[in-house]
Design a protein with these regions (language model features):
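Extended alpha-solenoid helical-repeat scaffolds
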Residues: 1-277
Length: 277
């Protein structure tokens, strides 16, 4: 195990050297499928974490296909927190690329850009969830205990209802990486828009919300949510509130703050908290 780990770390160092990339392209093309299998299926968690960093370096040079990137992003739902944390930086890169594509050629305000960032995150999580559902179905229909889905590092077993939900796992893993996840107010602002109005009106080409003939505000397609995306953002919102309160409560216990007046409320921006909470 130790020898394999050292070999992976040496490979990681090689990909960090810009001068080596051109000479490594042939190796990458030949072995990247095997490297991805190691990231998703290896029995040694330390090896998996290191391989994920290798793949992150490979991806920075544009050497991974979209389906390969998507397969790696499923690890944000892995049952092992070390894997989820290890892949968080990779997921952030995929999200940033998606946001850039979504905003390309559009002149948007800062608020609109923030809404588009949330839309991008929701869209990715929905797509990854669907991919994981398909993987689970294949696993359930297979009698081969060594099928790839059974060996995918515990990702499939996250479906166990006794364990945390997928979105809760993603919130924990991406909390420090993707800004919208820790910004519950931003999530709430987008949820409060009437996304159903767009289905009843012709799509507006202008990159902003506009009023329809019926008087309802039509949400621009750049940040318009499907029902599945709304459900995901609601889960993100709930998870964000819980984590923010949990962290603040833990900090309060450490600091032994007095339980008096408004200072006793551990929640950030307590005065602006939604009334439903």
């Amino acid at each position: 195990m130790h020898v394999r780990l050292e070999a992976v770390r040496a490979l990681e160092d090689a990909y960090e050297q810009e001068d080596y990339i051109s000479s490594l392209q042939s190796f990458t093309s030949r072995f990247k499928t095997r490297i991805i299998q190691m990231a998703t299926s290896d029995v040694d968690v330390s090896v998996r974490v290191s391989v994920i960093q290798v793949l992150r370096s490979i991806d920075r040079h544009g050497l991974l296909e979209d389906d390969q990137r998507g397969k790696l992003c499923l690890l944000v739902f892995d049952e092992d927190p070390r894997i989820r944390k290890g892949v968080s930086g990779f997921v952030k890169g995929v999200w940033e690329d998606d946001v850039s594509e979504r905003l390309a050629g559009k002149k948007l305000s800062d608020v609109e850009k923030r809404q588009a960032e949330v839309k991008s995150l929701a869209s990715l999580l929905v797509n990854w969830g669907k991919a994981l559902d398909k993987l689970t179905i294949r696993e359930d229909s297979s009698e081969d205990e060594e099928s790839p889905s059974k060996r995918m590092g515990g990702v499939v077993s996250v479906m166990d209802p006794e364990k945390k939900g997928r979105t809760a796992l993603a919130v924990e893993a991406l909390w420090d990486e993707i800004d919208p996840i820790s910004d519950w107010e931003r999530l709430l602002d987008l949820l409060l828009l009437d996304h159903s109005a767009a289905a009843e009106e012709e799509e507006d080409e202008a990159p902003s919300s506009s009023s329809s003939p019926s008087g309802r505000t039509v949400v621009d397609a750049t940040w318009r949510l499907s029902e599945a995306e709304e459900a995901i953002i609601l889960e993100l919102f709930t998870g964000s509130i819980r984590k923010a309160v949990g962290e603040a409560t833990a900090a309060k216990k450490v600091c032994c703050l007095p339980d008096t007046g408004s200072a006793s409320d551990p929640t950030p921006s307590a005065g602006r908290r939604p009334s439903c909470f």
